[in-house]
């Protein structure tokens, strides 16, 4: 399936090295969930990866974006917990600034109740940052 994604082709101090491109996304592997991305958080590690300053160095080219929320569009043959149409959230090292992604089913969680896609996508890093600030740094 053809999707649009933002690809970083080289290390850069700004986002000048990022282009919107069309790529081929494979069908999900047997234990993967394919998610139509509805929201993707922008976090400090995304910028650090683009600048080549993050401890993890993704292979070039790569799409930034580590936290995303969306709708399950397909599942691998061994996935039993999710079905197409489910509202879900996941965390990835990179790849989220895309129209769709494939990710391991064990990294996917249901979005509770009527929580918006935007809030679900930004919850993890924001929560952990606040928690560490209050419990580790604030004491």
Regions found by a protein language model. Name each.
Residues 45-51:
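Cytochrome P450 core scaffold surrounding the K-helix E-X-X-R motif
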Residues 1-6:
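Short structural boundary motif marking the start of a folded domain
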Residues 12-14:
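Proline/serine/threonine-rich low-complexity linkers at boundaries of modular beta-sandwich domains
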Residues 8, 50, 73-74, 102-105:
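Short beta-strand-to-turn element immediately C-terminal to the catalytic PLP-Schiff-base lysine
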Residues 20-25, 69-71, 100-102, 108:
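Conserved hydrophobic/aromatic beta-strand scaffold that supports enzyme active sites
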Residues 17-20, 95:
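Residues that act as N-cap/strand-start positions at coil-to-secondary-structure junctions
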Residues 48, 87-139:
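NAD(P)H dinucleotide-binding glycine-rich loop of Rossmann-like/cofactor-binding domains
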Residues 24-41, 53-95, 115:
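Glycine-rich beta-strand-centered segment in the early N-terminal region that forms part
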